[in-house]
Amino acid sequence: MIIGFVGSGNMAAAMARGWAGEFEGMLFSDSGSGRATALAEELGGEAVSNAEIARRADLVLLAVKPAKLDEVAPELSGVSQVASILAVVPLERLQAAFPGAEVLRVMPNVGTEVRKGVLCIAGEASEVVRAKLALLGHVVEIADADFDEATAIMGCAPAYLALAVEALADAGAAAGLDPELARELVVETTAGTAELLRVRHPADVRKAVTSPGGSTEAGLEALDREGARAAFEAAVEASLQRMRG
């Protein structure tokens, strides 16, 4: 199977890296940024035109800006399978843009680069395409109407979580730890906590670590005073508002 990436931005690059070696060929296009050439050189693919992708690709990964859909769709006429990662573009509009094709709406996150991503999907796809997506992480089938809300959580969350890790590591360094040691401790703690959260509810984990009158309790009280929970709620709401214009 040959895959064609129409658009070679950060998210497309993350997915392509996660898929390295899993396709017979990788084709990349861009709008003149040079990213397609860079990705092709990095991953052993080819930088080509959208028309070339339409001729050769078995699966098209649509990763352009949403406003570019009407411009690129005619260049991809006749393609048989399309997976779109365009934010805020509903399945119905995608199906209208690619009549006769199997169209799948996908919202991945950057964890796909290391095959630990979350991918929300809706629409039609062959078992082969679904299996390829599953290589990149945890696939969840959701209603098309839920994509904006899901994106505000799983699509944006890696940045929010990375900010929390960065802040904790900086706090550790400010307290006297070597900065690299502080980062290592926080990153590994985050990874272990993520595994624990697979089998235990977040509230249970929080309570298990928090001894009455202890240092964790003091830290959580400080986070409450500074509005940590409200800040996350505000971040999700702001993300939704931006997506919806």
Locations of regions flagged by a protein language model:
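Glycine-rich Rossmann-fold phosphate-binding loop(s) that bind the pyrophosphate
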Residues: 8-9
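Short pre-catalytic strand/loop immediately N-terminal to key active-site residues, enriched for Gly-Thr
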Residues: 147-152, 203-207
